[in-house]
């Protein structure tokens, strides 16, 4: 689990940095016309990099930082749906699909499993730390 989160974190940091500094190479590689305003791509790079930091935080303290992983899961899932829609409409070339797969889609199943495991561990920790008189809550 921690190794996967470290890999995802490092990948996101590098991907974010490349979106900020080397965006022109990315456009060339994908065969997409570079827009006049680059700011949205660079802001997205900042967010991708911040998720990289977040995945490293989850790896360092999984239960405490588990909600960062939930945000990352939804971010990867929703951005994958939108990107596939753009490929389907022809706005992005089909060559973008392998990039999307390696950047986002491949992480969805393990992130989901890790999220479930961490939620169960957090619930167990909560039960252990709860005083006996508060074992059941009624609204």
Each language-model region and where it sits:
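Membrane-helix boundary connector in multi-pass membrane proteins
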Residues: 81-99, 117
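Membrane-water interface at the C-terminal end of transmembrane alpha helices
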Residues: 105-126
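Juxtamembrane helix-break-helix junctions at the cytosolic face
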Residues: 26, 53-67, 87-88
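Non-cytosolic membrane-interface motifs at loop->transmembrane helix junctions
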Residues: 30-39, 67-71, 93-103
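Short, highly charged, low-complexity non-transmembrane loops/tails of multi-pass membrane proteins
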Residues: 124-139
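Hydrophobic alpha-helical segments of small multi-pass membrane proteins
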Residues: 69-83, 100-111
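Core segments of alpha-helical transmembrane spans in multipass integral membrane proteins
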Residues: 10-18, 36-59, 71-81
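Membrane-helix boundary elements
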Residues: 1-4, 12-39
């Amino acid at each position: 689990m921690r190794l996967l989160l470290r890999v995802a974190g490092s990948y996101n940091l590098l991907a974010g940095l490349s979106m900020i500094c080397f965006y022109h190479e990315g456009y060339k590689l994908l065969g997409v016309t570079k827009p006049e305003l680059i700011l949205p791509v660079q802001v997205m790079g900042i967010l991708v990099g911040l998720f990289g930091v977040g995945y490293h935080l989850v790896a360092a303290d999984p239960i405490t930082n588990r909600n960062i992983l939930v945000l990352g899961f939804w971010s990867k899932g929703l951005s994958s749906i939108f990107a596939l829609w753009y490929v389907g409409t022809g706005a992005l070339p089909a060559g973008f699909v392998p990039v999307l797969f390696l950047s986002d889609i491949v992480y969805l199943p393990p992130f989901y499993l890790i999220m479930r495991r961490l939620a169960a561990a957090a619930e167990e920790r909560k039960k252990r730390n709860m005083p006996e008189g508060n074992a059941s809550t009624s609204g």
